[in-house]
Amino acid sequence: MEVLKRENPLIHMITNYVTVNDLAQVTINYGGLPLMATHHDELKEITKMANGLLVNIGTLEPYQMESSMISMKIAKEKGIPSVLDPVGVQASKLRKDFAKKLILEGEPSLIKGNLAEIKTLIGETSNSIGIDSFDDSLSENTKNKIKEYARERNLIVVVSGVVDFITNGEESASVKNGTYKMSKITGTGCMLGALLTLALSFYDHKDLRFKEVVKAVSTWGICGELAEERLREKEGLMTFKHNLLDELSIINDETIKEREKVIYD
């Protein structure tokens, strides 16, 4: 049976107000159509027509929390792939409790977070201040716990870091693309969440989605490397950010294949 890649999937995003414009832009640059809706009177209609859903809890407020839960449940009911980005889940009890409720009742297809965020979800102690993670090494014991967490919940977990780790509990991959400068730009993790939602929405076949997720993680890292290589003397982080989004809009499969640093476990 021929498997067709969906063109220009519609991505519904309920996200934080810090990075909302950047998420819309990376979605367009990676081949998707962004739509941000939170009003309860249109949520059901919007979510049902979407090819993918992203929920980002970076700036929580009561109305948005209700919107997130409504949309996650609809996505679950309709079989629409969904991504949860539990930004700063380790920072407060509210975030932690709400993220766990979303996971339990909304059953996301994928959870993306930095190591501190993912360790919090699996019940480990994290090294962080506020929403920022200072955990930089992923032990084999923690890897195994993450695999078990993914397997038990039938979802994909993406752990972003110096080396990104992706697992669905059965398959696992490590991605070594990227640059330190990406960690100095507000929202690069949130932007990755948008790319991962797109990766899930390109195909209806679940067996193709894991490799698309790995490709999206690697692609984002490669764009960071290329953006840094374009920097000239006295060009700083804002030029780097511009280059990063620019590279995402022009990168092709040939460049990805040449530069990807992916190891499957």
Swiss-Prot record:
Q: Name one GO molecular function term.
A: hydroxyethylthiazole kinase activity
- Catalytic reactions on record: 5-(2-hydroxyethyl)-4-methylthiazole + ATP = 4-methyl-5-(2-phosphooxyethyl)-thiazole + ADP + H(+)
Top-level enzyme category:
transferase
Cofactors demanded by this protein: Mg(2+)
Query: Which InterPro entries does the entry mention?
Result: Hyethyz_kinase, Ribokinase-like
Q: Which CDD domains match?
A: THZ_kinase (cd01170)
Q: In which pathway does it act?
A: Cofactor biosynthesis; thiamine diphosphate biosynthesis; 4-methyl-5-(2-phosphoethyl)-thiazole from 5-(2-hydroxyethyl)-4-methylthiazole: step 1/1
Against Gene3D superfamilies, the record matches this protein to: 3.40.1190.20
Residues recorded as binding ATP, renumbered to this chain, are: K112, S160
Please indicate if the UniProt record lists Cell wall biogenesis/degradation as a keyword: no
Give the UniProt record's GO annotations in the biological process aspect: thiamine biosynthetic process; thiamine diphosphate biosynthetic process
- One family from Pfam that matches here is HK
The keyword Nucleus appears for this protein: no
Q: Which UniProt keywords apply?
A: ATP-binding, Kinase, Magnesium, Metal-binding, Nucleotide-binding, Thiamine biosynthesis, Transferase
> Belongs to which family?
Belongs to the Thz kinase family.
Q: What does this protein do?
A: Catalyzes the phosphorylation of the hydroxyl group of 4-methyl-5-beta-hydroxyethylthiazole (THZ).
Instruction: Note the HAMAP family from the entry.
Output: Thz_kinase
This chain belongs to which protein, by name?
A: Hydroxyethylthiazole kinase
The gene coding this protein: thiM
